[in-house]
Amino acid sequence: MRNLAVRYLLLISLLGQSLAAAAGAPAKTLCQAPCTSEGGWELSVGLGLGMSTNPLKGGSDIPLLVRPRLSYYGERVFLDNYEAGVMLWENSSQQINLLVLPSLEQLYFRRWQYASGGFSLDPDFIKGEGAAESTGDKPPHLHHRHTSALGGFEYNASLGGFFDGLEFNWQFLEELSGYHAGREMRLAISRDFLTYWRASLGANFQSRDYINYYFGVSASEASPLFSRYTPNSGGWSKLVRVEYLKPLSPHLAIKGGAALKIFSSAVADSPLLEESSVYSLFLGGVYYF
């Protein structure tokens, strides 16, 4: 109960500070360009061709055709799509933030249906329509994987000296919504190069409880298709990302990117998965309103 109370106090503190918008230095000043000017809202929409693979058994690739982005950076408060926070402290090269954001793992499980070829993501889910009728046997019961609210601290630093040009990001997050008692720690380094390019390397640690909630198989869920599975421990997943952004005018830019995530063995060993990694690709244009 004490840990749950601390988590909700953290969330309440963040929301309270967001509403108060206390005066101070600009929030999230170390964000990647193009950054929203202090006190301003920015809305952009990316249109193009892209996809993200689904690691679940029989999971269909997820199309990435429209990529909206809404951001706001105030004096201490910031909102960047699904991420909201309050800047607690900063100097010329470092920053500490209080952060709230949703989990993403549940997206793999949206509108699953069991067809003759196995499980697949219902393509109508991507288009925002109703669920298609299943064409095979009734799927084994899997509990609903909820979207979890994650909250915690973030540290950003622009490095100098031998590492000049590198940006470092660290996040420590706890589950706030009470679905599981998981924790996640994220590490990443990024660098701009060749004017329009940006490369990032990272690693995410997810605790045993976190992995078990999304990728474990409980006794009530076990079936001939999916044996019971509980991870023995947490694990580190590795990530690499390359992005391209070339402005053509104040309102238009070309954007592309590719990303690869290699799951930890604790995730990859789940009987729900048939792939131990996921990758995504996107190429298109972005319009800034």
Question: What are these regions, as identified by a protein language model?
Answer:
Residues 1-39:
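Cleavable N-terminal export/targeting peptides
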Residues 23-78:
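Short glycine/proline- and aromatic-enriched beta-strand/turn motifs that initiate or cap beta-hairpins
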Residues 31, 82-190, 195-205, 212-232:
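Outer-membrane pore/translocation modules
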Residues 37-45, 64-66, 75-77, 92-98, ...:
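Outer-envelope beta-barrel architecture signal
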Residues 47-49, 68-74, 85-88, 153-163, ...:
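Residues on the lipid-exposed face of transmembrane beta-strands in outer-membrane beta-barrel proteins
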Residues 52-66, 115-117, 140-143, 266-269:
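Surface-exposed strand-loop-strand hairpins of Gram-negative outer-membrane beta-barrel proteins
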Residues 227-239, 245:
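A conserved mid-domain beta-alpha-beta active-site/ligand-binding segment of alpha/beta enzyme cores
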Residues 244-289:
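Predominantly the C-terminal beta-signal and adjacent terminal strand-loop region
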